[in-house]
Amino acid sequence: SIVNRKDYFNMLKVTLISARKNTSLRLICLYDGKIGDPVYNLLKDFKVEIIIHELPYKKELMEIYSHEWMETELGKDIEYSRIFGTFMRMEIPIIEKEDEYVLYTDMDIIFNDDILLKDLPHPAYLAAAPEFERDTKRMSYFNAGILVMNIQGMRIKYQQFVEMMKKRQRSTSGLFDQGYLNELCFNDMEILPIEYNWKPYWGINGNAKLIHFHGMKPCSNLEEAG
C-alpha cells in the first residue's frame, strides 16, 4: 500500500495528530489493508474506529482502468491498491447507519480548528470546494478530498454509480472516483467554503479550518504529484 511508504505514512500521522489535538471529531476509517500492518497499528494508536471493508467492484475497476489504458491515456501505470483506496469514499453512504451527515477527508490533511456540524453546509447530496480555483463562482469541477455528505441523498447517487460499474462505464468528467462524483453530483452540489479545503499553494490563510496538501505533497516529487 502506498500509505505504508514513509512519506505518506507521516502525512497520515500528521492528519491524526492534528485531528486529535484540534477537534472533537469522531474518527472513522474505512480500511482494506492487512490487520497488524503499520498503518493499521497507527490508526489503533490514535483510537480511530476501523471499519474493515472491501470494494465490491474491484474487478470492474480493473477492467475500466486497465494497465494498457493507463499507460496509453496517462502515460504511467498506477497501483490498483491506490485506486481502490480512493474509491472507498464512494462506499460511505451504504456503510453509515447512524448519522445524517458525514465529513469525509483524505489522509493528507491538517485539522487547524474544530469542525462543527452547525457551521457546515447541510446539502441534499454533498458539499465540496473547488479543485484548483479559489473563486467558487468560477468553479467548474470540485475536489473530492474533503466532502460533506448527506447520507440519504448519496445513497441515490451510489446506486447510479453502481449501475455505471455494471456497464463498465468510465466517467467522462475526470479520473477515477473524483470524476464519477463530479459527473453524478456537480449539478446538485452545494459549495463548501474554501476555508474547509484550503490548499497550501493558495498562500497563508489564518482562517483555514482544514489544510489539504492537494497535488504536490511534502517530500514528494513532481511525478507523484500528477
Task: Locate each region found by the language model.
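A glycosyltransferase accessory/donor-loop signature
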Residues: 1-2, 7-14, 62-63, 151-226
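Short, acidic, metal-binding catalytic loop of nucleotide-sugar glycosyltransferases
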Residues: 18-25
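Short internal beta-strands
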Residues: 26-33
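Active-site-proximal specificity loops/subdomain of glycosyltransferases
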Residues: 37-96
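Active-site regions of enzymes building and remodeling cell-envelope glycoconjugates
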Residues: 43-54, 124-127, 207-211
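GT-A fold catalytic core of metal-dependent nucleotide-sugar glycosyltransferases
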Residues: 81-141, 148-149
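Short, solvent-exposed loop/turn segments at the edges of secondary structure
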Residues: 141-144, 206
